[in-house]
């Protein structure tokens, strides 16, 4: 295993250049194998979990879901606030920011982004709860792709570009996750569900963050600095893939629901019209419709 890890490190160095020494020795960052193994285990559970649960009763998980979602809400809020203050203190340039230009503020950003990387491992539990509750319809290609890819991408980010221009997408995503996990936490309480109206807008917010991230990343391409261009091109490509998948999800989830509701409304309207026609042709008593019969003349 050590030989394989050494070969892998040599390959990564040849492809991406030397690693950032500031994260040397940090938990899970020294070699890629633990992150890769966690991802493989995740995909195996996604595949085998629903099969295991097929003939079993779903678990409620209500109590642990409240705690889990509250924990991720607080962690996301912490990361968002720390990233905003770190960027402000380091006087980060919106258009392009290198990885070694802000001193201690860079280290603050690196520490927070390690938590962001680690949170992607914690978020595997999203899928496991879907499996335990037998909500298999929520385990979509988008869901699995997003969860599995983010952990791996951020291992590479933390080892090569752990600060600088990398902050923007993580900052926006942390803010969106404050809204998202607070929604999930509240929706775990049945009495709160009628008051939760903003799920649709969370998806819109996610799409907006991808667009804003592409714009901000493109600034680094147009007005380059010491931040490696290859990472910027990769991020733009990845954001485009997420926009495509999230847009498809949004159309499938909300536009089709709206079309279905309009169809049901039209059907009800047509049924109402037919009832009126049938009431006439089947000679219903006019008294049933609150219409007084006219007296017949006797001439």
Swiss-Prot record:
Family that this chain belongs to: Belongs to the ELO family. ELOVL5 subfamily.
Membrane topology: Multi-pass membrane protein
Cell location: Endoplasmic reticulum membrane; Cell projection, Dendrite
Subunit and interaction comment: Interacts with TECR.
GO CC field: dendrite; dendritic tree; endoplasmic reticulum; endoplasmic reticulum membrane; membrane; neuronal cell body
Alphabetical keyword list: Acetylation, Cell projection, Disease variant, Endoplasmic reticulum, Fatty acid biosynthesis, Fatty acid metabolism, Lipid biosynthesis, Lipid metabolism, Membrane, Neurodegeneration, Phosphoprotein, Spinocerebellar ataxia, Transferase, Transmembrane, Transmembrane helix
Enzyme class: transferase
Function: Catalyzes the first and rate-limiting reaction of the four reactions that constitute the long-chain fatty acids elongation cycle. This endoplasmic reticulum-bound enzymatic process allows the addition of 2 carbons to the chain of long- and very long-chain fatty acids (VLCFAs) per cycle. Condensing enzyme that acts specifically toward polyunsaturated acyl-CoA with the higher activity toward C18:3(n-6) acyl-CoA.
InterPro entries linked to this entry: ELO_fam (IPR002076), ELOVL5 (IPR033677)
Record-given protein name: Very long chain fatty acid elongase 5
Tissue: Ubiquitous. Highly expressed in the adrenal gland and testis. Weakly expressed in prostate, lung and brain. Expressed in the cerebellum.
EC identifiers of the protein: 2.3.1.199
Catalytic activity: a very-long-chain acyl-CoA + malonyl-CoA + H(+) = a very-long-chain 3-oxoacyl-CoA + CO2 + CoA; (6Z,9Z,12Z)-octadecatrienoyl-CoA + malonyl-CoA + H(+) = (8Z,11Z,14Z)-3-oxoeicosatrienoyl-CoA + CO2 + CoA; (9Z,12Z,15Z)-octadecatrienoyl-CoA + malonyl-CoA + H(+) = (11Z,14Z,17Z)-3-oxoeicosatrienoyl-CoA + CO2 + CoA; (9Z)-hexadecenoyl-CoA + malonyl-CoA + H(+) = 3-oxo-(11Z)-octadecenoyl-CoA + CO2 + CoA
Pathway: Lipid metabolism; polyunsaturated fatty acid biosynthesis
Biased composition (Polar residues): 279-288
GO biological process entries: alpha-linolenic acid metabolic process; fatty acid elongation, monounsaturated fatty acid; fatty acid elongation, polyunsaturated fatty acid; fatty acid elongation, saturated fatty acid; linoleic acid metabolic process; long-chain fatty acid biosynthetic process; long-chain fatty-acyl-CoA biosynthetic process; positive regulation of fatty acid biosynthetic process
Main location: endoplasmic reticulum
């Amino acid at each position: 295993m050590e030989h394989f890890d050494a070969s892998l490190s040599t390959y990564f160095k040849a492809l991406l250049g030397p690693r950032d020494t500031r994260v040397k020795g940090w938990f899970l960052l020294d070699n890629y194998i633990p992150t890769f193994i966690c991802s493989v285990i995740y995909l195996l559970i996604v595949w085998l979990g629903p099969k295991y649960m097929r003939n079993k009763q779903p678990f409620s998980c209500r109590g642990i879901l409240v705690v889990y979602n509250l924990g991720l809400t607080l962690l996301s809020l912490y990361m968002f606030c720390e990233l905003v203050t770190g960027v402000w203190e380091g006087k980060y340039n919106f258009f392009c920011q290198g990885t070694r230009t802000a001193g201690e503020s860079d280290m603050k950003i690196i520490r927070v982004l390690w938590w962001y990387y680690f949170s992607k491992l914690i978020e595997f539990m999203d899928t496991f709860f879907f499996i335990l509750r037998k909500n298999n319809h929520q385990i979509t290609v988008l869901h699995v792709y997003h969860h599995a890819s983010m952990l791996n991408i951020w291992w590479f980010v933390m080892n090569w570009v752990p600060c600088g221009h990398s902050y923007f997408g993580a900052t926006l995503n942390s803010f969106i996750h404050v809204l998202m996990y607070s929604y999930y936490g509240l929706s775990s309480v049945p009495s709160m569900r009628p008051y939760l109206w903003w799920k649709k807008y969370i998806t819109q917010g996610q799409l907006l963050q991808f667009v804003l991230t592409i714009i901000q990343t493109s600034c680094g391409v147009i007005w380059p600095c010491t931040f490696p261009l290859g990472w910027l091109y990769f991020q733009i490509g990845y954001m485009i893939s997420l926009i495509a998948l999230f847009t498809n999800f949004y159309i499938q989830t909300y536009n089709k629901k709206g079309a279905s509701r309009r169809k049901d409304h039209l059907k009800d309207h047509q049924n109402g019209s037919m009832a009126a026609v049938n009431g006439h042709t089947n000679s219903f008593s006019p008294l049933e419709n609150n219409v007084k019969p006219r007296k017949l003349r006797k001439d």
